Amino acid sequence: MNLAIIGATGNVGRKTIEILEKSKIEISNLFLVASAKSAGKKIKFKGKEIEIQDLEKYDFSNAKITFFAAGSTIAEQWATKASKKTIVIDNSKFFRMDNDVPLIVPEVNLDQLQNYKKNNIIANANCSTIQMVVALKPLHDHFNIKRVIVSTYQSVSGAGKAPMDELITQSKDFLEGKKISSKNFTKQIAFNLIPHIDEFVDEGYTKEEWKMINETKKILDPNIKISATCVRVPVMVYHSESINVEFEKPVDIKSIKNILN
């Protein structure tokens, strides 16, 4: 099978390449695509060097499945066009709340995957949403979830490479007693917690919190009441979450542990 990755040189694109390298998926050809400034560069995949192609000149019919890992702007501009020639799996937020595009977490709602055929596009959920619904799904099946209160503690990798570099620089400057400047966050991130991710929207939530609330409803159950607080923490990679759940049916800790195990 032929696969392609749009945004192959970014954090998400490189991680996708890494996952495919370790996977058992039989790949005949892998096409790596990025902006013009990255075109011509090479990335090694399974012992071979693959040349980066220019998105503006790329032929989407090359691959059966194309991963979009370049953000919402690129998805908005190119994904629908690409879907005429290839199955699109988009990692950005652009299509997530589109009623005609399935929002898929394979461990949770794989049965909805068949709905991709209408537009030939599959949306991938937000990172913090994914780890929560994977844990909640089996509990919801057994006890019917009524309400969820979640607090997330999200690393700077979720904001991109520049914020990761800023954390390193700020940490070094802080320890050396130098003046700290912030370009990628509203406040200093080194040795600090920032209790909002992205811009504020209705009812005092941030966009990140809004995504968690509404994506979970679309994936799991629209009737679940959800409140979310998302915090950016001075950690390079990996997110963690604290989740309080209220069920419709009586539960006990032993049953929950058995189900999750």
Give each language-model segment a name.
Residues 186-237:
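Oxyanion-binding "anion nests"
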Residues 1-189, 225, 249, 253-254, ...:
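N-terminal Rossmann-like NAD(P) cofactor-binding subdomain of oxidoreductases
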Residues 224-261:
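C-terminal active-site/capping subdomain that shapes the small-molecule cofactor and substrate pocket
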Residues 140-142, 196, 239:
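Histidine (H) residue identity feature
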Residues 17, 213-217, 257, 261:
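Generic solvent-exposed, charged/amphipathic alpha-helical segments
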